[in-house]
Amino acid sequence: HKPGPGAYPVPEVMGLVGIVALEERRGRRPVVTEERVLGLRCLRVSVPVRPGLREDRRKRRAEQGAAALYRAGVRRALTAEDFPDWPALEGQGLRSVDPEPFCQAIAVPLALAALRRAGILRVRATVALSGPRVSRPLFAAAARLCPQVRHLVVDVPGEGEELAAWLREEYGAAVLRPGGAAPDVTLAFGPGGEERGTVLRLYGPVPGLAGLRPILEEGGLPPDLAPLPLLSLLWECGRLTEGQIRIHAT
């Protein structure tokens, strides 16, 4: 029988999102304005900085900006990739956008991009999927990869055997046991599994994508915002589909 995927957290309801930007300008007070980023309504707080500004003052201004966003109803924020003051934002109740659901949803394109970069044909490739349980994204990735690659390895305690048996029955797939043939790519949906080949860690606040970078197929992203949290937000609120994404390999 078809194994049921384990519980999977549903992305939270989309709320007003903030942008915290350190901007070189005169003044001391953060300024809040409303804007749209790729169709998303956002509140941007401009935090004034200048060359030579002491670190403690910059952090204090970032805290003031975060507090202003929180009072306006913002709970999650986007920033530049190298934004230095996340602890100050978190101290005022803001948090980053969780990239895990998005990264796990695009596990298959990421795996295929890793194979292309390595020059490995799909029909000769072995891909491993690991995690602490058979989650919905892991199950979906396994079912999609079966017809596309030579071998799958399902490295999940307990539930993995049931999933492997179902894949063999449903697709006639060659599903190998963990610890055997070395995979070319490992898709890790959580900690604890064996990591061999090119390892894509699709979990946690900072997923490890082994130099692969999702980008928009058409049009660019704002250069002043970290791309992965923004793409995760667009995907979460239904403004982004897999067909609009291209995986750039570095």
For each feature predicted by the language model, list its residue ranges.
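Short, well-ordered secondary-structure micro-motifs within conserved domains or adaptor modules
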Residues: 1, 15-23, 176-208
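N-terminal basic/disordered segments at the start of proteins
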Residues: 1-39
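Adenosine-phosphate binding glycine-rich loop
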Residues: 25, 32-34, 46, 198-250
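Electropositive, gly/pro-rich neighborhoods at or near active sites that engage anionic ligands
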Residues: 45-65, 73-92
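Well-ordered, non-membrane alpha-helical segments in soluble/globular domains
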Residues: 55-71, 108-111, 138-142
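Gly/Ser/Thr-rich loops at beta-strand to alpha-helix junctions
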Residues: 79-86, 100-105, 130-137, 157-161
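A glycine-rich, Thr/Ser-enriched phosphate-binding loop motif common to dinucleotide/cofactor-binding enzymes
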Residues: 95-113
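Glycine-rich phosphate/diphosphate-binding loop of Rossmann-like nucleotide-binding domains
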Residues: 117-181
